Structures are given as C-alpha cells and as structure tokens.
Amino acid sequence: MESMILITAPAAEPVALADFKGLLDIPLTDTSRDSTLLMMQLAAREAVENYCRIALITQTWLARLDSFPSAPLRYDRNGYPQVLLPKPPFQSVDFFKYVDTSGAVQSLTRDPSYGTNLAAPFYGYQLEPGGGIMPAALSPPWARPWAPQRMVPANTALQYRCGYGGPLTVTMTAGSAVLSSPGFTFNPDDAPQIAGDTGTAINVPGAGAAGAALATYVASVSNGIATLATAATAAVASVSAWQGNQVPNSLCLAILFQAQFFFEQGAVCDQLEPRVINSLRNGGYRNLVS
C-alpha cells in the first residue's frame, strides 16, 4: 500500500495576511479575527494544492511503497519501471532506501552516468527531475533492474523536498558570498542521492548595495554550505531569505479567492465555487501525471 507522509510542513503561506484582509476590507489594525483568517488561508492553500496536485511552498514528504515498480504493460519490453514523485515541482531527494532480501535496510545512490560508469554500484537510480507541474521520475540505471527486495510491507522509502520555493533564515558577512543557514543543509551536485541545489535562486533582503536585496543564485555547495554567485555588499544576520522560485501569481490569486469563499460561506457550505477560482487554478498548473 502506497502512503505519503508530510515530514516538514511549509514554513510560510504564499499569500500574506495583509493581502487577505485587504480583499475582505478588514483594517490591518483589526486583529480580532486573525486566527480565523489564518485558518482560512491555510485551508485555501491546501485546497489549491490538492486540486492541482502540486506543492507550492517548500515542504518535505516521505513516500512509502510496498515494492519497486514494474514496467507498465502498455510499454511492453521497452517499459520504464519508474517511481513518479507526487507533488511537483521537485527539488531534491533526501534519501532512497529499501529492504534487501536479507532484511537489511540499504540506500540507493544516484547514477548520473546512465549506466556507463562500470565502477558505480550495480543497483542505483537515474533521476529525471521533471519541471513545473511535471513530476520527477526515478528509474534504474540503464540496462539494470531495481534491487532485489524482501517482500514485506513498506519495503521502499523515499524522502524528498518539493515546492516552488520557500523562506530560509540566513546570515551573511559583507564581502563574502558564503550563505550561513543554521539547521538547513544544501545539497551539492556531486552528492549521489540528490539532484543538487546548485543554480537555485536566492533573494537575501538587505545584503545588496544601499540596503537593497541581493538577488543571485547558489554557485557551489561544500559540506552543506552554499556559496552564492555574488558576494554580499552589507552584512545581514538572521534575515528571512527566499530560496527557489516564486509561487505563480495565478495560484496566489486562486488562494485569495478560495479563502474569501471559505470565510464568507462559513466552514460548512455546499455552494459551488466561483468560476474565477477554477479559471485561475486550471491555467496550466494542474498535475495530471502523478
């Protein structure tokens, strides 16, 4: 039986509370209903994510399977026994483990050589990271099978990060491109079991010239610490940076109108949703694959 377990929830919401209050004509100084509004925002974001079958803000999930997949019959002998990761956009794999025939837990590592590196472990996986609403696909290295397994429930576990992007608390020193983020480990491109965070967009408030934001990207990763492509002009300490891409504006608007609908109709409602919500979330953002 396949199951999905949320390991790390989003650290923020795509829509600011102030924007939601503005839509409802509630003064920012009126905080009497903030807890209700935040609950409606969360419910609206989850409704949009569940409908589109994607992840908006960075989150970590654990997928548990009862076995590696077999090749779909419709592909005959040219089939690809792929693991398709739900909730795109994909970011990186934390680990990929399975129970071998002796009952021991083993880790699979990524083979970026597509099976041409004979020195690589025989059992591993290839990664096609997908993009946008297309899910990542993991398959055995070329001309190799998945590893033999002991047939017990939940004998395969894959933990991964997904979402367009999310907030990250960081510190930078003036003149340095090193990004310090306690408690967060960046994934290097040469690590065996992940796609790599090199090239990920980073926006650090206050670290640019004249107090502006430093908009750059991860140039390299060493021991889990990222070095950016551009050094900080000013020092910043424990500021909330943004790692990755921004959530598409259409989906943010869909969340706003969905939250407004929940707020105005109440917790129990059988009314049809406004057409504008369907139009916004159907605008090329629905994952129909995994």
Spans of features found by a protein language model:
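Divalent metal-cofactor coordination and adjacent catalytic microenvironments
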Residues: 1-175, 179-198, 205-290
